[in-house]
Amino acid sequence: FTYTPLRNDLYNLDTQQEAHQFEFPYADNTFDVVVLTSVFTHMQPAEVQHYLIQIKRVLKPGGHCLSTFFIMDKNTPEILKQNKDLMQFTFEYDTYYLHDDKVKDANIAFKKIAIQSMANNAHLNIKLLNNGWWKGGDKSASLNYQDLVIFTA
C-alpha cells in the first residue's frame, strides 16, 4: 500500500496532483488482486477510466479487481424518486449522476452502461456485478451497501 494524496473536492484540496494523471507506482503484472472500496464512488469518469487502465496494467493475467460503485440501471432513478429516504442522485450527466453538483466528488453514481464501457476501454472483463442495498434492494441478496463489481484481467 502506498499513500498518495490526490486532489478531491470533498476530501483533499491541499494538493494539485490529479487522479486522472496518477501513475500507480508498481510494475506491470504485479498483483493477483486489487481492492477499491468506496473509491470510485468519489471519482469523476475520466479518473475512474484512468484507474481501470492502471489496474489492468498492474494486475497479473487472470487477476481480479474488487471494487464498489453506485450504479444506476434503468430502474434506479424511479426507485430513488419514490423513496426519499434513500441516497439521492438528482443531477444527471451523460454517463453518471451526482448527489451534489457543488461538491462533484461527494457521491457519484455511474450508469451501468458506462461501467461496461470503461471496463472495455481498459481491457477488463466484468466477472460479477452484485447490486448493493443503497437503492432499497434486499439486504439478504446483496453483499455490500454499495454495488460490488469484480473485474478480471
Could you say what each language-model-derived stretch is?
Residues V35:
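A conserved beta-strand element that flanks and buttresses the S-adenosyl-L-methionine
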Residues F31-D32:
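Local beta-strand N-terminus motif with an aromatic residue
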Residues P25-A27, Q44:
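GHKL-family ATP-binding catalytic core of two-component histidine kinases
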Residues H42-M43, K74:
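Short glycine-rich, flexible loops that bind phosphorylated cofactors or substrates
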Residues T15, M43-Q54:
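A short, conserved alpha-helix within the catalytic core of class I
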